[in-house]
Amino acid sequence: MTSNGEGGEVVAKRRRKGIKELVQVALRGGCLAASATAMAVMLTATEEGVADIYGFKLTLSSNWSFSPSYQYVVGACAGTVLYSLLQLCLGVYRLVTGSPITPSRFQAWLCFTSDQLFCYLMMSAGSAGSGVTNLNKTGIRHTPLPDFCKTLSSFCNHVALSLLLVFLSFIFLASSSFFTVLVLSTP
């Protein structure tokens, strides 16, 4: 028994629960950081250049807002940033006050559903952006147009980094959802 009368088993169980809750808060923080950085990198994706196509000089200009897919990525990131910030603030508050992060099964189901919703939102945004980025990188094969990224490499690098962070944010949300399932599976 410990000094306050608790058995070693109870103390170990409480310590494991505290570690799980700390991991949940860390996952929320990671998701917030990845989503916010993805949005910031995408918002700074802009470049101008000159392409040489069969001896003709064409001025190319690109901005993230020219593509509806990239607009969708920015919108999905903005929503995920707000959701992650709310969950992070709630988690930190509950850690500081010593209350459980998911006090009820209803709240655990609500967190699970919300995590899944934003998880799929980020996956669909990343997939939509990846399709456009792949087209920019490879060019249009059945026409003589070269790939876009030779001329505007900085723009393409910004977009690729942003999409990588979007998929990282998806992994954080999926992991957070997994931890919520662990909470739901314990009696």
From Swiss-Prot:
Keyword Ligase appears in the UniProt entry: no
Family, as annotated: Belongs to the Casparian strip membrane proteins (CASP) family.
Subunit text: Homodimer and heterodimers.
Sites where a glycan is attached: N63, N136
Keyword Mitochondrion (UniProt): no
Transmembrane segments: 25-45, 72-92, 108-128, 163-183
Cytoplasmic side: 1-24, 93-107, 184-187
Localization, UniProt: Cell membrane
Residues in the Extracellular compartment per record: 46-71, 129-162
Keywords associated with the record: Cell membrane, Glycoprotein, Membrane, Transmembrane, Transmembrane helix
Name of this chain's protein: CASP-like protein 3A2
Main location: membrane
GO cellular component: plasma membrane
Pfam families per the UniProt record, alphabetical: CASP_dom
Membrane topology: Multi-pass membrane protein
Organism: Arabidopsis thaliana (Mouse-ear cress)
